């Protein structure tokens, strides 16, 4: 499960991918977490736009006021779940990031680790949205990531952003087949556990 990530200067990072940015500025967020408004790329007829959407999706059909917002959707079942099957077909988005956090469970403790691309390029998370909310798509952890956690966000290359947003392609099949970037990670301070902590020190190796 992906529940925290880092995003710095999203407007600059997506300048070659979008035509405009709406209510998004070049800021630095070292502890992006659910229920925050975060930069997401959406496709319109006249081009892509970078918008601020709330991380955590409550489907339109959910009438229970206590329904918990969904922050992740499993790639393996996204075409089957009533919450997601229409969204992966018609409402795809891409969240931009620099890296993300995962926690390794060790006996009674969980230790945070920070993941980035090995080539240092920006990270693009595949997602889905409904109105002003979005969630990230996850898959089984690959290679060394599984040492820390059994799930990971689906990450696509910048060259595949336009393809994923192309609704003529079958979204889940594309995500299963496309090339994924290599990731590296290191242990970080448990200060990241507190959502209100937000500084560059959170991503420093300990």
Residue ranges and their predicted role:
Residues 1-206:
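Short linear sequence motif anchored by a di-proline
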């Amino acid at each position: 499960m992906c529940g925290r990530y880092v995003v710095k200067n999203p407007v600059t990072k997506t300048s070659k991918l979008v035509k405009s940015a709406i209510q998004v500025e070049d800021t630095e967020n070292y502890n992006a977490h659910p229920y925050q408004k975060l930069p997401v790329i959406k496709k319109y007829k006249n081009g892509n736009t970078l918008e601020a959407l709330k991380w955590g999706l409550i489907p339109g059909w959910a009438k229970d006021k206590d329904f918990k917002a969904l922050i992740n959707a499993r790639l393996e079942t996204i075409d089957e779940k009533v919450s997601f099957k229409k969204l992966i077909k018609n409402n795809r988005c891409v969240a931009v990031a620099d890296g993300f956090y995962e926690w390794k469970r060790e006996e009674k403790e969980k230790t945070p680790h920070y993941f980035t691309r090995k080539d240092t390029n920006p990270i693009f998370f595949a997602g889905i949205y409904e109105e002003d909310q979005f969630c990230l798509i996850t898959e089984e952890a690959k290679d060394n990531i599984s040492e820390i956690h059994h799930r990971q966000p689906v990450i696509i290359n910048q060259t595949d952003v336009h393809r994923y947003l192309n609704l003529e392609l079958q979204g889940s099949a594309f995500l299963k087949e496309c090339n994924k970037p290599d990731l590296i990670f290191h242990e970080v301070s448990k200060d990241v556990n507190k959502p209100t902590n937000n500084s560059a020190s959170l991503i420093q190796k300990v």
